[in-house]
């Protein structure tokens, strides 16, 4: 990182606004021309905000809520008040370089990242199911050009981290890169029976290796990537408030192991007016979980193939045509020595297309459609101890996901757009059967989104202002019904979410940047939901605020560059259940950091996260026949130092 990282915010804002291509648009659309709500953060911005895992993105993206429900493999993600009670079928999907990530791997470390794009609102036309709230698209650095390397180490009262990456030019056409990350969370729970003082510790290792074929004078390009992530954790504690306050418990120490292996081959061919893209991916994840509810083992293998053709038909018309295939095999086993097994196979075929047509120099029209066929088979062995009969069932569904958008470039720096888009959560069968009623399965949950947005640059490029008004109606919502412990996942009635999103970036000088973002909305159950009609949707705060400030001290004061950063975020009250009986009150988290760029090769960052040591819950559930609830809790105050070396 050069010294200009801190001293050229003018360059950064001009680059991002005028020439940044939004890869998640799949049509190479510029940020200032896209007709949907998009937020982008570069690697430098993420570093200054202390974002090094996907769950940290809520520090910089207002309206994004990522919280664990038990452990990080079962996370809840909310955008625009849309979340999912079934953690196997989220409403927000995460992609890394165009490859869909397993639902149990949403909260992964950010390794070798170039930037992160957040698309808000249903994205069913381009991305299919599980994108009702939006998508998070992670774009990594690719080895192009000269050889380089990076190493960094962090130490804090809560964890230690080691990071390393290297890029190598093998010849004029062939490049390779590798990235590694190791994280050790120390833990702070005292286990009374064993007197262990770090009973909630964890270790995680992630690695990525890639080979790029990028010839200068050939239309063909290719990238082969192999990645691995290994988590060994004791994080899944469900504590009473008293146990959390005292940081001690007599519960058995939980265990969680998660291994994820990912393989991807991306190929491109430039035919001139048409660019062909192929993305082939295979991801395998294994989970072993021993917790307060027993023992659970599960494996999931996902094979996917996407083909796309982007064509610039004329100066006024560009088109995208694509096809998608996915085969997902899930295999679970409940309890040590138990014969209860569940195998679910899901096969998906989809065709999709989108066209952008310029009606004139200022107004363009976007039309898109996706047609998806999904077939699912469930083979459950039954569980006599839970009085659940065995079943072998098949289910299939066809889904159409249309989109229409209209954009008006009022001036070179101002754009207004409106859109109607759709999204859905696929139907199928429960991956964790709890009742014989699960044999009937459930149908797709579908959402329709209306949006009016704007994006403008004011005051001689000193102010960036964007926002959107949105309305989302969801039909056939998928909910767990019945008595706790034997609930059935089924379709009920309607839900509705509406609100306002605002983002402001102010650059009063080249050395000072101010960011402010907020979301203000209402999300509630509507007709067809019996006793919960009118209640607020779980994990749907009415208000979120994110504020940040970055200031580079005058360089004459120091040798090198010193930057001061602060980020704060407010989340209003959140309900953990549909009946709205369990909740977390509104809270504010504040982070501070000082970064010292000694020279172009060496930098140091002193940081404190959650400086006020604010306590907050991320999940709660009631103990049956009791007024006491068991909960998961957020991370407390962290103080640490990071040292980074680049060459």
Where are these regions (language model features)?
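Extracytoplasmic beta-strand/coil segments of soluble accessory domains associated
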Residues: 55, 59-99
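Transmembrane beta-barrel wall of Gram-negative outer-membrane proteins
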Residues: 148-150, 154-185, 194-233, 261, ...
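Gram-negative outer-membrane beta-barrel transporters
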Residues: 318-319, 364-365, 373, 466, ...
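Membrane-embedded beta-barrel scaffold of Gram-negative outer-membrane proteins
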Residues: 266-291, 409, 415-421, 443-500, ...
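N-terminal periplasmic accessory domains that precede
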Residues: 54-57, 76-80, 95, 115-118, ...
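Short acidic/polar hinge/loop motifs at secondary-structure boundaries
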Residues: 99-122, 441
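C-terminal beta-signal and adjacent terminal beta-strands/loops
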Residues: 569-577, 595-647
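Outer-membrane beta-barrel domain signature, strongest for Gram-negative TonB-dependent receptors
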Residues: 196, 201-319, 326-328, 464-466
